[in-house]
From Swiss-Prot:
It comes from Saccharomyces cerevisiae (strain ATCC 204508 / S288c) (Baker's yeast). GO terms for molecular function: ATP binding; protein kinase activity; protein serine kinase activity; protein serine/threonine kinase activity. The lineage of its organism: Eukaryota, Fungi, Dikarya, Ascomycota, Saccharomycotina. The keyword Kinase applies. This is SNF1-activating kinase 1. The gene is SAK1. Pfam families: Pkinase. Residues 82-93, 640-656, 707-741, 785-799, 958-971 have a biased composition (Polar residues).
């Protein structure tokens, strides 16, 4: 009983799972009792039967759906709507093993059409991926485009991708004899695609897929790859026209190639296609030695003449009469219309009166056979017209049998074989196309079947196999082919960019979801195509995950793309199978894609635009583009704004420590404050703190605040002149009381309000924030030179006090707004009465040495004279943005930005004029530089405002001329450019003496090594001869002082002045006299006074002593104090006579 129970259990396992489930649901006792044991044994074996049902279900489903899984996987990789319907219907009718092979063959013959191209590139491994094809190398390039070797990622199949231009390149039409009716490149592409879509034969190169994106200027034809390349018949270093033999192939190899070409050509002629360019270069050999015909660019679909488009086809036929290779032209093509009279041709037997027929391919086969046998062309010439004449008139010539037998390549067996080869060539290269050999006659020729007929009779197995091959070759293949028809409409719509196929299909269907909405982690987006109802085929892209495209009802006619994954697979096809079949297929495809991703790092892949630059896959700057894209979105770079699509990323650092527009590096500590990057609070784009960002986002130039009046933030040396005319900031924005400064604190994260008014706040990424972040104070910030000897200045250091306040106010936070705008504007924020802003400021006292040195070099704005007594100079709001609390660019503060009195300036560096304590006998109060100096400056003249009077001093004045030409004992304290030319034609104009007072005082106290003003006058612009001179003696006397009075050259200077007077008076005696001199200034006791300020009366009192001390020289001193005027010769002689008297 136990054995029988076991046998019954074995029988239960063999029951199909679907039938077993139905039997259990039905509950019919009669059917169950036939295969179930007795009641007593059934209770004992209930657990065993339950476990066996699961095993039976899995085993039966695996066996029955093995072929279905393969077919379903192939179906999901197709991309044309008609293919899905065709395969689904064939599988639904006969879901058997034989039908699956048939459908696989039919699906293999179908050409995929893709109108969405995705190109990615890995700059590290130099790997390019076009949709699902990985580009390996270049196979070659020719007239119509390049050919690339690629590998299908899913099927691991090697393919050849032919890249052709969508539009014909513009050519020069000058001095050319090209007919306007010549076939265009675009028509060749359309013709080739339309023909290859219909042709599916063993000896014809298979078109696998057409990648045709309207955005790209290139069309990619994915072709079958022939690993052994084209047929070679001459040495590679020799041109075809210069080849003289022998051939590179033997007679037997040539015979096998000929048989493959004849079979492929027979198929094409049966389909009504004239190849028109049969030659060895268009014959490719696959890895197994199969010969395949390629390049249908100039082919002619002759079957279209029977359609309604016959008139249009006739025009197309006339356009394509003389295309191809001239050396392989048939005689009727060379003659044209004369061929009808010469060969007595009837137009009814040809194509609508044209000389084009199938016979031109037969002639080309004969020329190809001649090249393969003898290694040279039958007719050749350097000129095309002479070549045509030879093709029509010259007889065919052959080398002798001894020459062929002597070479070690041909390997001809006997002379009879050679004669058979000559006979075949004579029949193929018949001048008259009506007498030329046909394809059935070629197949039965003795030379073609020579190896079939000369097999040793001893080997019966070999004999039987060879006989079978001969019968298969010589049989008529027309019964095995299905005729195709290529109409004019199909030629136009062969390329989707030319016809209306996309526009028509879009009206009937809804395309897939736009790839831009998908995840950015996948670098190859799924190919989007026009789809009909019931279509669930997609082209799988690299790195994509296949799962669950669920088809909607037939009434909806669209796909469900709402799942989380990128690509969905239809699990509800027209197949009757188990539910786990689709999941098995999904796992297999995912496994293949995961292997591919593991082998190649997908993180380095960069999407390339499909344009004219990168579409050829050979751009010279593809690496630069890819590296730039990787640098923008690289996670290693620490770019915090990379996730925000609307914010452009910027480099992490710029030159000279200046801050970029967007702060990109957040993890690298700044040199000025190595602990501050740990803070989690930062400024938003509005200028306020935001706890949700850990990086500092600067406003771009298009989002400037009102403080800079729309001016861009520049860091160049022209900032001083660019920001001179900025409007004055209101007092309410620039004034901050001292009590407010003491309450100024770094805000806590909890007290920071969120920028609700910022429209871009929702698009910015939020980061977690650590509460109560402590920031230790920095005692000695790096790269800041603070004079330790000056204790009073160190207490008021703006940078140091800023960190001290940060340390003291970490518990009492208050929100404040950093003032944006000009880098140099309002450093101290304490200017109330200045109407302009200057970058050249001066410090007015000794107690503010450190602050004054800082403001004189790197700050701007209008600093008041009592800035040393004001404690509000280092407030945080008035600091520039780079010195803010959360500035990410502390390296912007360099040593040259914070100078002190002992700083060593660069060689010959022009520094601004500074207020200094003048220690001289004059006891002059040094006037300060007015804040309006820069606003009143001009490009044509250099003006230095001295004193509060605001007198202007031109560098081409007489005082500078005298200073530059007069000899001095000590080192010259001023530097003058070489462009200043002082000659007799220079206009000399008298000026006030207050200008000279300042320079003279500065010259005594400031040697060249000390930081002082270096005056460089410009080239004199006015060079006009005149008799008006200045009171040169007054200038020399005043400028000389005691040192110059003791100089031996003092008299020489006075004497040279007299000579100048004589020269001017003698040569220009008839000119207009000058204005009468001032008699008051002519007196000896005359004093030089200043008319501008009461505080400068001391100048007049101190300078009056020069007139009293000048009594020693008598009459000479009296003449020098007189105002200069034009003198006659008589007056000069009289003065000389008087001076000569004792």
């Amino acid at each position: 009983m136990d054995r029988s129970d076991k046998k019954v259990n074995v029988e239960e396992v063999n029951v199909p799972s679907n039938l077993q489930i139905e039997l259990e649901k039905s509950g019919t006792s009669s059917s169950v009792s036939l295969r179930s044991p007795t009641k007593s044994s059934a209770t004992n074996l209930a657990g065993m039967a339950e476990g066996a049902r699961d095993n039976a279900s899995i085993a039966s489903s695996s066996v029955d759906s093995l072929n279905m899984l393969l077919e379903r996987q192939r179906v999901r990789q197709l991309n044309h709507p008609q293919h899905q319907q065709h395969i689904s219907s064939s599988l639904a009718k006969t879901p058997t093993t034989t039908s699956s092979f048939c459908s696989s063959g039919s699906s293999k013959n179908k050409v995929k059409e893709t109108n969405r191209i995705s190109l990615t590139y890995d700059p590290v491994s130099k790997r390019k991926v076009l949709n699902t094809y990985e580009i390996i190398k270049e196979l070659g390039h020719g007239q119509h485009g390049k050919v690339k070797l690629a590998r299908d990622i899913l099927s691991k199949q090697l393919v050849a991708i032919k890249i052709v231009d969508r539009h014909e390149k513009k050519q020069r039409k000058f001095f050319t004899f090209i007919k306007s009716s010549k076939i265009s490149e675009n028509d060749k592409i359309k013709r080739e695609i339309a023909i290859m879509k219909k042709c599916h034969h063993k000896h014809v190169v298979q078109l696998i897929e057409v990648l045709d994106d309207l955005k790209s200027r290139k069309i990619y034809l994915v072709l079958e790859y022939c690993s052994r390349g084209e047929v070679k018949w001459c040495p590679p270093d020799c041109m075809e026209s210069d080849a003289k033999g022998p051939s590179l192939l033997s007679f037997q190899e040539t015979r096998e190639i000929l048989r493959g070409v004849v079979l492929g050509l027979e198929y094409l002629h049966y389909q009504g296609i004239i190849h028109r360019d049969i030659k060895p270069a268009n014959l490719l050999i696959s890895g197994d030695g199969t010969v395949k015909i390629s390049d249908f660019g100039v082919s002619l679909a002759a079957s279209s003449t029977n359609s309604s488009d016959s008139s249009e086809s006739l025009d197309e036929l006339e356009l394509a009469k003389t295309v191809g290779t001239p050396a392989f032209f048939a005689p009727e093509m060379c003659l044209g219309e004369d061929a009808f009279t010469r060969y007595n041709l009837t137009k009814e037997n040809l194509f609508r009166g044209s000389c084009i027929s199938f016979m031109i391919d037969i002639w080309a086969v004969g020329v190809t056979l001649y090249c393969l046998l003898f290694g040279m062309l039958p007719f050749f010439s350097d000129f095309e017209l002479k070549l045509f004449e030879k093709i029509v008139n010259d007889p065919l010539k052959f080398p002798t049998f001894k020459e062929i037998q002597s070479n070690k390549v041909s390997k001809v067996s006997c002379e009879e074989e050679y004669e058979m080869a000559k006979d075949l060539l004579l029949k193929l290269l018949e001048k008259n196309p009506q007498k030329r050999m046909t394809i059935p006659a070629i197949k039965k020729h003795p030379f073609v079947s020579w190896d079939f007929d000369h097999v040793p009779e001893n080997d019966e197995k070999l004999l039987s196999s060879v006989l079978e091959q001969k019968l298969r070759f010589q049989c008529n293949q027309t019964d095995q082919f299905e005729p195709i028809s290529i109409s004019k409409h199909e030629l136009k719509n062969a390329v989707s960019g030319v016809g209306k196929k996309i526009k028509e299909s879009v009206l009937k269907s809804i395309p897939l979801k736009d790839p831009s909405d998908l995840s950015n982690k996948n670098y190859l987006h799924p190919t989007e195509t026009t789809r009909g109802r019931g279509d669930a085929n997609v082209i799988v892209s690299e790195g994509s995950v296949l799962s669950n495209i669920k088809e909607l009802s037939a009434n909806d006619g669209c796909l469900n793309t709402d799942s989380d994954t990128n690509i969905n697979i239809n699990d509800d096809d027209h197949y009757s199978g188990d539910d786990n079949d689709g999941h098995l297929t999904k796992r297999e495809l995912e496994r293949e894609l995961n292997k591919f991703d593991d082998k190649h790092e997908a993180g380095n892949m960069v999407n390339l635009p499909i344009n004219s630059s990168f579409a050829s896959l050979d751009s010279f700057y593809i690496d630069n583009f890819a590296m730039a894209r990787m640098g923008m979105s690289s996670p290693e770079a620490g770019d915090s704004v990379s996730s925000v699509p609307n914010l452009p990323s910027a480099p992490s650092s710029t030159r000279l420590g200046r801050s970029p527009v967007f702060s990109g590096v957040t993890n690298q500590p700044s040199p000025i404050r190595p602990v501050l990057p740990q803070q989690k609070s930062s400024f938003c784009a509005t200028g306020r703190y935001d706890k949700s960002h850990n990086s500092l986002l600067r406003n771009s130039s298009s989002h400037l605040t009102s403080y800079n009046s729309g001016r861009p933030s520049s860091r160049t040396g022209r900032m001083n002149s660019r920001n001179q005319n900025l409007p004055k900031i209101p007092n309410s924005l620039s004034k901050i009381s001292t009590t407010k400064l003491t309450e100024l604190r770094v805000p806590k994260d909890s007290e920071i309000p969120s920028p609700a008014k910022n429209p871009n706040a929702d698009r910015l990424r939020r980061f977690p924030v650590k509460k109560n972040t402590k920031t230790p104070a920095i005692k000695d910030p790096p790269r800041i030179n603070i004079n330790s000897s000056d204790k009073s200045g160190s207490k008021n250091s703006p940078i140091k006090s800023l960190y001290q306040r940060m340390k003291q106010s970490k518990d009492n936070s208050k929100t404040f707004e950093v003032r944006r705008g000009n880098f140099f504007s309002h450093f101290n924020g304490d200017d109330d009465d200045s109407s302009s802003q200057s970058s050249v400021t001066s410090s007015g006292s000794e107690s503010d040495s450190e602050l004054s040195s800082t403001s004189s070099s790197c700050t701007s704005g209008t600093q008041s004279r009592n800035s040393s007594n004001n404690n509000a100079y280092s407030e945080t709001e008035s600091l520039p943005f780079e010195f803010g609390v959360d500035s990410e660019d502390g390296s912007g503060v360099l040593l040259r930005d914070l100078p002190n009195e002992d700083q060593i300036r660069p060689f010959l560096d022009i520094q601004p004029c500074r207020r200094m304590k003048v220690k001289s006998s004059l006891n002059l109060e040094p006037p300060s530089v007015s804040s309006s100096s820069s606003s009143s400056s001009d490009e044509d003249e250099l003006i230095l405002n001295v004193g509060t009077a605001g007198h202007r001093r031109r560098h081409n004045s007489s005082k500078l001329s005298e200073l530059s030409n007069s000899p001095q004992k000590g080192s010259n304290n001023f530097m003058y450019s070489n462009g200043s030319v002082h000659d007799s034609e220079t206009t000399i104009t008298p000026q006030n003496m207050d200008d000279l007072t300042l320079h003279q005082a500065l010259s005594r106290s400031q040697p060249i090594s000390k930081p002082g003003p270096l005056v460089l006058p410009k080239r004199l612009d006015q060079k006009k001869a005149t008799t008006e001179t200045s009171n040169l003696t007054d200038i020399v006397e005043f400028n000389g002082n005691n040192d110059h009075r003791k100089d031996k050259n003092f008299d020489k200077v006075l004497y040279s002045r007299d000579l100048l007077k004589d020269a001017l008076s003698s040569t220009n005696a008839g000119r207009r006299r000058s204005i009468p001199s001032n008699k008051i200034r002519g007196r000896k006791d005359a004093s030089i006074t200043m008319s501008t300020n009461v505080g400068n009366d001391e100048h007049a009192r101190n300078t009056s002593c020069h007139g009293d001390k000048g009594q020693e020289n008598g009459a000479i001193k009296q003449r020098t104090h007189e105002r200069s005027r034009s003198l006659t010769v008589a007056e000069l002689n009289e003065e000389k006579r008087r001076s000569a008297l004792p």
